[in-house]
């Protein structure tokens, strides 16, 4: 099992942070364009799920998968979106995404007066702690294959 990449978006679609670990194929477009496409897809899926679901969707959509990867999604009440792409063998990771938001982003970025909100995260401490946390996950594989 493995982690491919992670996106962190604000409520307006600004990509606050992007990391990758075992991404085998690049999108072939500039990163800014990739971020816009990802956010647009998330917006569309979220809207579709909320309108088409036969049941009340308390948590909205949590994940979707293709034949090659699984996208995990977590949205906070303030509209911050945490997205992690993994391989298909990874089960639900809502608690992992919540931890990334609450213990890393909120503690190291939001509560840091030197980190302006609504802009790309420049904190090296956030980046290194995020990297360490993701690498410590039981489904993170040093040998993605």
Curated annotation (Swiss-Prot):
Its main location: Golgi. InterPro entries: Longin-like_dom_sf, TRAPPC. The keyword Membrane does not apply. The keyword Transport applies. One of its GO terms (cellular component) is azurophil granule lumen. This is Trafficking protein particle complex subunit 1. GO terms for biological process: COPII vesicle coating; endoplasmic reticulum to Golgi vesicle-mediated transport; vesicle coating; vesicle tethering. Keywords: Endoplasmic reticulum, ER-Golgi transport, Golgi apparatus, Transport. May play a role in vesicular transport from endoplasmic reticulum to Golgi.
